[in-house]
């Protein structure tokens, strides 16, 4: 069975008063007891007896108000400043009077360099497993960028080095500079914001992230997971020029190009106008030399061809062949005439033989050819010419017609 107190706060007709809610929240929080918390100092204000700090979680971009006795800060194992990574022991508190939440700490420990490096290594393995370091994902750096996006500290040596070296190499180079904090708890949000702004600018062809050297703590923002993932998501090529040669923050592995120093970044992003001009001049010189050598070789080859007898007197071979043609034509004509004479004589002989062996010669010797009419069949027997048969008798000088009177028995 529920009581009116159990139903309080569950309907607009029976609301809780503020004091009741605040008291309940304070009781819930008080049950947490003492807890160890790790974070990064973003603010530190010291009053007469109390120190006020803000602890930030870089991975989640959340913060928590912290208070402690002033002596606790003064006796901390390391000097405390904005950006210091610490582990604190404290008791969460909820102040019912103003509804604020805070952490009252009683112990401060610094996160050692070894632990920081171990965490960076764990994050490195995680990002590597996700493929963020894959060389196949690296975007090519343009040969001559129209505008270079530069993210760096205001009036820093890194900014001066990049811009000075780039201008000396290519005087017409253009920059879109975004000055940000490059260390401490606020560095990551500012750098990420600058990256997004430059990546959205269609006129920016490459982005350079530049910072001078520093301690492991100083370079922590450049191994931040949020920043690394933002670099990986950029569509514009990103060059990491953070620290000096020995430094190796995680952004170096995610970026499309890692430069050892800001000066090295300027050299690798901007071509050297003098060197390019010298290269073009050398190309022109080598091209001209190659062309001259080719012309010389071809001229020498042509001279060799022209020195050959056939080219020195090109008509000589034609004349020699013409004489051969004339001789061949004359020989062909002689052969044709001889063949015509021989064949004419042969035809004469054949004609004479034909005349001798032909029927005309037989008729000339007194013989006759008798044919029955009108079928002109040659008469071979007397039976073929009974009485009354019309006959045609062919003799040497013509033909005679006759009529058979019958047969006469041969004796």
Swiss-Prot record:
Single annotated GO MF: exodeoxyribonuclease VII activity
Q: What EC numbers are recorded for this enzyme? A: 3.1.11.6
Q: Which InterPro entries match?
A: Exonuc_VII_L, Exonuc_VII_lsu_C, OB-fold_nuc-bd_dom
Which GO cellular component term is one of those annotated? exodeoxyribonuclease VII complex
Superkingdom as given in the UniProt entry: Bacteria
An example of a Pfam family matching this protein is: Exonuc_VII_L
| Top EC class for this record | hydrolase
Q: Where in the cell is it found?
A: Cytoplasm
Keywords assigned: Cytoplasm, Exonuclease, Hydrolase, Nuclease
* A biological-process GO annotation: DNA catabolic process
Give the catalysed reaction(s), semicolon-separated.
Answer: Exonucleolytic cleavage in either 5'- to 3'- or 3'- to 5'-direction to yield nucleoside 5'-phosphates
**Member of which family?**
Belongs to the XseA family.
Annotated function: Bidirectionally degrades single-stranded DNA into large acid-insoluble oligonucleotides, which are then degraded further into small acid-soluble oligonucleotides.
What is its quaternary makeup? Heterooligomer composed of large and small subunits.
The entry's protein name is Exodeoxyribonuclease 7 large subunit
């Amino acid at each position: 069975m529920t009581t009116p107190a159990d139903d309080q706060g569950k309907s607009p007709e029976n609301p809780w008063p503020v004091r009741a809610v605040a008291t309940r929240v304070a009781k819930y929080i008080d049950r947490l007891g003492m807890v160890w918390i790790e974070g990064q100092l973003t603010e530190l204000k010291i009053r007469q007896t109390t120190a006020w700090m803000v602890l930030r979680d870089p991975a989640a971009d959340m913060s928590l108000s912290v208070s402690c006795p002033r002596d606790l800060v003064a006796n901390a194992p390391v000097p405390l400043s904005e950006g210091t990574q610490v582990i604190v022991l404290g008791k969460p508190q909820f102040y019912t009077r103003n509804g604020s939440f805070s952490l009252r700490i009683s112990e401060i420990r610094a996160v050692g360099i070894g632990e920081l490096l171990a965490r960076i290594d764990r994050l490195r393995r995680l990002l590597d497993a996700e493929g963020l370091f894959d060389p196949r994902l690296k975007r090519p750096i343009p040969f001559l960028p129209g505008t270079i996006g530069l993210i760096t500290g205001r009036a820093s040596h890194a900014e001066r080095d990049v811009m000075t070296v780039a201008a000396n190499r290519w005087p017409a180079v253009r920059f879109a500079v975004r000055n940000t904090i490059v260390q401490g708890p606020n560095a990551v949000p500012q750098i990420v914001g600058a990256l997004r702004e430059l990546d959205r600018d269609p006129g920016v062809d490459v982005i350079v992230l530049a910072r001078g050297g520093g301690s492991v703590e100083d370079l922590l923002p450049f191994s931040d997971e949020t920043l690394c993932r933002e670099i990986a998501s950029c569509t514009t090529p990103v060059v990491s020029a953070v620290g000096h040669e020995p430094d190796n923050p995680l952004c170096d592995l995610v970026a499309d190009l890692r430069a050892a120093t800001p000066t090295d970044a300027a050299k690798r992003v901007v071509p050297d106008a003098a060197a390019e001009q010298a290269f073009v001049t050398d190309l022109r010189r080598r091209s001209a030399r190659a062309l001259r050598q080719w012309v010389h070789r071809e001229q020498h080859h042509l001279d060799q061809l022209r020195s050959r007898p056939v080219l020195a007197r090109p008509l000589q071979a034609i004349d020699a062949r013409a004489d051969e043609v004339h001789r061949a034509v004359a020989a062909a004509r002689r052969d044709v005439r001889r063949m015509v004479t021989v064949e004419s004589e042969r035809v004469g002989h054949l004609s004479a033989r034909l005349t001798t062996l032909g029927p005309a010669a037989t008729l000339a010797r007194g013989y006759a050819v008798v044919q029955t009419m009108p079928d002109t069949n040659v008469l071979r027997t007397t039976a073929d010419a009974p009485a009354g048969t019309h006959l045609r008798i062919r003799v040497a000088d013509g033909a005679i017609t006759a009529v058979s009177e019958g047969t006469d028995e041969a004796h």
